[in-house]
């Protein structure tokens, strides 16, 4: 049995059991368990003060834990940080680089710190800065500097990459470009631990997400099934012509924008009934749409329910 437990820790990129950390009388982390598989993008979500930063800093080896077991790439970051450091890349929210070096000089400098670095030119191309290779950092845009931060983190060819709010302050186009860079990393077999406040970012990038609130993991699973959102009632929304009355059971109170909406547990049957009625009565259903709760809806619901129930224990939701 002990052999099986040891093997599971070695074969996971990150394994956490019963992680605890306090600051004086404040319990920042209260018994967290996490498994992150090699090659996956894992997003850690949670409100400010929930314990995300403390948890990540413990995994990175920058903060000591009070209790629990932590394995990162098969090592304890509290004892073996020197062994982990060459295999880990970190992209912080804010980093400082010499603004008068070129992009190429910057990446080459950081690559020289590692025993087996990735080719600087390859890293620069990977993050989409090939055209800026010989440009000085001072001439780069905010989004390009963020790409450079990522190139620096990749210079040592890490197995595990920590991304802390990687697209904060980006415009929509730059965010999409950054997402593709992260996707490329996963395609190379890199493991990525992402912290973000953007739910669409987690939805697009993450294979699995965990929601942390008040120091505990309160939900975990693929974005599509987190909090059973795939089984939640769908919302059918449409606009009726003046004077038209929809079939009973397929109309709720108007939403205030001239649309009617109804919660549906059987979308196919309800849509068939609604559209059949509309065809039979020559009624146009303007703006007809069907939606399910978004990841943001589920996240707000989960964290709201958790905040209301603390400090008592809350169930942990596992999905997939």
PLM features per residue range, with description:
Residues 68-76, 84:
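Conserved ABC transporter NBD signature motif
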Residues 108, 112, 118-133:
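Conserved ABC ATPase "signature" region
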Residues 161-165:
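Catalytic Walker B motif of ABC-type/P-loop ATPase nucleotide-binding domains
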Residues 225, 232-305, 320:
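Short, charged/small-residue-rich alpha-helical element at the C-terminal edge
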Residues 178-265:
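ABC transporter nucleotide-binding domain
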Residues 157:
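Conserved catalytic motifs of ABC-family nucleotide-binding domains
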